[in-house]
Amino acid sequence: MKKIVATGTFDILHPGHIYYLEESKKLGDELWVIVAREKNVVHKPRPIVSEDQRLKMIQSLKCVDHAVLGDQTDMYKPIREIDPAVITIGFNQKWSEEKLRADLAERNICADVVRISEYTGMPFTSSTKIIDEAVRRRTK
């Protein structure tokens, strides 16, 4: 069975997230999703939605076979435990594919890295865009 791992914050679930996960699932037989812990989200504003609620939403998606919270101290721990063939990253995730591949190899994790393209089928395909629009509409 070919396992795929997708990772993300998934704050304010939107069509871009669904696209990312559905495209990730197409790469294998079993999709595992690692949902970022609140304390580990340091590259952008803290999530609005709690990690438990974000996990529950991801677990409810048809394309997701398993969803777990990330480890609070070692982001590679769940990846080692899942042992995926492929790790997907979203089009706007800050990872460099080359750096991630090197980090995985350094830890003896044999997984390919695939960046999923951007979904452009709808206007609100990022949490930031949704938040900005909500603020704009409510402060008129």
Curated annotation (Swiss-Prot):
Any Gene Ontology biological process: FMN metabolic process
Highest taxon, organism lineage: Archaea
NCBIfam families hit by this protein: cyt_tran_rel
Gene Ontology terms, MF aspect: ATP binding; FMN adenylyltransferase activity
InterPro entries: Archaeal_FAD_synthase, Cyt_trans-like, FAD_synth_RibL, Rossmann-like_a/b/a_fold
Family indicated by similarity: Belongs to the archaeal FAD synthase family.
Enzyme type, top EC level: transferase
The keyword ATP-binding is assigned to this record: yes
Protein name: FAD synthase
Quaternary state and interactors: Homodimer.
UniProt keyword annotations, A-Z: ATP-binding, FAD, Flavoprotein, FMN, Nucleotide-binding, Nucleotidyltransferase, Transferase
Pathway per the UniProt entry: Cofactor biosynthesis; FAD biosynthesis; FAD from FMN: step 1/1
Assigned EC number: 2.7.7.2
Residue sites binding ATP per the record: T9, F10, H14, P15, G16, H17, N92, Y119
Cofactor(s) it depends on: a divalent metal cation
UniProt catalytic activity: FMN + ATP + H(+) = FAD + diphosphate
Transferase among keywords: yes
Free-text function comment from the UniProt entry: Catalyzes the transfer of the AMP portion of ATP to flavin mononucleotide (FMN) to produce flavin adenine dinucleotide (FAD) coenzyme.
